[in-house]
Amino acid sequence: MVGVPLQWFLKDDFDGKEILWNLFRELVYYRELKADYAYYCNRVSFFEDAAQGMRRLMYEAVFSREARDEIRVRAFVQHYCHTEVASLFYLFDAVYAFHYVRNRAPYYTTPEGSALLASLYQKERGVYWEHTETALHLQFAYALAERVLFHDMPKGCNRACIARDPVVQEVLRTLVLGTEMSNFIHSEFFPLSGEVVPTKHRDRIVSVFLLEHFVRLWHLSVANITFELKNITDRSYDPFRNERAFEYTKSNLHAVHSRDGQQELKKREDVFESCTTQFDERFSISPKERKEFARLLRTTHRLRIDMRSFWKSLIGKSVQWIDCYEGKCPKGRLNVGDFVSVFPDFQEFRGRDQRYKLRVYDRVYEVRACTLRPAQIEVSFVVDNSGSMNKEKIASAREALAVSMLSLKDFGEYSDMLAAGRRERTTIHSEVYYFGSSFIKVKSFGKSKSKDFNSAQLIKASVNLDGRFGGTNDAEVLKHILADVERRRARVSSDTSFVKVVLVITDGCSSYPHESRRTIEELRRRGVMIFGFQIGLMSPEETALFHDVWNSTEELGLLLGERLEYLPRELLRTLRVVLSKVHRLSSGERLHAQRVW
């Protein structure tokens, strides 16, 4: 809601239709102010800079050298020049507002509406416009404004032109970038596309193309005028008359912008909260789960940002280019050997002015290298949910799981963005298993599911780890993954079209270590890259058993112990190494698990 004082129009004896027009015009000014309040706060400084040339000329042409340093003289000159220059910019603000309202209110394009605007124009013009001795610079400004205002008005509109000096008429005929001045201003202020032209851009147009003529004509007008200083002791060049009023206006502008910004932010927050609530209700995500996931996002934000930078660099480097050379081309780099061999023909072609038909040039160009990338990358997270997982271990595992899945999601999005420029497409998916005495899949790959469904599963898999599954039977879940890999290998066309990565997080040694070791070795023979991460304090016997399972032939297991805060970083570092190796894969090469720390 915008309030405009009605007495602004009553004192000018406007009727109802004219008041309505002026209300529309004031709303245009308000829209301009709201669109770029910061520029309006500093517009006075812009006018001061624009008036520098006029102030210099006034000092030189009007006042004696002895009087230039007087405070009264400086105040008068600054105020006078500021007022004159500002009037030019404010005039074309009014011109823009005039057209803005007219183009958006169909009534004012009709003959009746156009006649109303013409009569209102003459009423606002007043006696000042009819004065035959108007200063040259004001004749120029108002005459140009009139031409722009009535650029496309119907011929029936009655409009009177003020008397113009021949010098002014000559300036108005000046071409700007090969176009008549009024047509140029009209095209810049009112483009055919209908786009809104910001105040800053309009001020630049006026400053660059009109201000010079305005100041020159002003100089011709005041060259023979005698100025007298009367009652200007406390006069200021500030259009707000005093600093206090100016600061008050600026504070109001800042308050309006701050309020609008807060309202816009609150509106976005309300929309986001509404969408989040609908999402949670749709997929049965409790407020407790949402709160815990928000905590995980905050605590792992820095790690995720670092991984995004790494993914962008990795994917960018994965696109390889090779130089190709082509000879005997009509253009390019001259091949001296070819030129010597066809030199007799060259002389003949030269006489016929056909020498450019000779193919004696080499051309070098780049083509994208055809490299073989895996069509699918699958990452399985196997997380210990046994009773020995205490609060600290669960929190660390949740953070590691959340940031890893989110980072893989980011990697997949970046890879999809680049897919349009590559001959192959690589998709990446993740799944999550909780294991204890038995195991359960809490997140599937979701290849045929919607993005919302996959996001909901990611949230639940990140926050539902609670340590309620009893023992530590990791062998069973690893056998399940092995069986799935065997089925998958039978369906893929080659070993390099499918890459499988398994990351196991556990807080102790396996309940069935021998079965676990045999399954891990079998997975490695199948080309699966598998790694284990141990968290929590263990006895020497348990440590030896862990090494026997994971590091008997090759070091695939990492003992973190009580350094729980390192788990998210080490998990992400492993993903970095693995996916870096995947993107360096060439045709015919097979992936094998190897030590990454």
Swiss-Prot record:
A Pfam entry, by short name: VWA
Q: Cite the VWFA domain residue spans from the record.
A: 378-575
Its recorded name reads Uncharacterized protein TP_0246
- Gene3D superfamilies this protein is in? von Willebrand factor, type A domain
Q: Which residues form a coiled coil?
A: none
Q: Do you know which SMART domains this protein is assigned to?
A: VWA (SM00327)
